């Protein structure tokens, strides 16, 4: 079980549903290894604890020339969110970019080491049910993540790991997914783990 940086912001009902789901895995003979049980898992958790910053820095830097061109050509057709992201990226240096590439590589090395311990990883796909969005009624205070918080997606992004999201939870009558994550370039095996999960584990609902 990989907590990622997202676990701390998961609501209690979603945590309850997920823990009940993990219990089903254990009842089916699957050993769930947590960070408190393994130094390898703890090392991986530490390496992905700022995965969002790493991912956003890398993609922001790599895209900022294209975004700058769009803003220069059609400033009124580009969202304020993109302009804000562009400003952050343009404040970076090549050294900042290189540092984040190195941090990404450290995370990938830690992920590879975990393969000696576990066949795959499981985590949530989001911190809870979809949020209510006011469509940015207040233009001076933009909602940071109008389509939901991607905290649980950053880790797999920087790891370059195959993952399958399955809607196995229902919280407050809204769907919440889990992710089955494999090692890099082991897409087929990750898919097989997800298939087994879907066929052998019952969905959990918490109202």
What is the predicted role of each segment?
Residues 113, 143-166:
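Small-aliphatic-rich amphipathic alpha-helix that forms the alpha element of a beta-alpha
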Residues 126:
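Short glycine-/small-residue-rich Rossmann-like dinucleotide-binding loops
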Residues 12-36, 68-73, 97-118, 146:
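Acyltransferase
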Residues 53, 130-150:
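Short, surface-exposed loop/helix-turn segments at secondary-structure junctions
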Residues 1-2, 54-108, 162-175:
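Short helix-loop capping/hinge segments that flank enzyme active sites or metal/cofactor-binding pockets
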Residues 30-52, 86-87:
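Short connector loops at secondary-structure junctions
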Residues 1-8, 15, 19-28, 92, ...:
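Structural helix-boundary/capping segments
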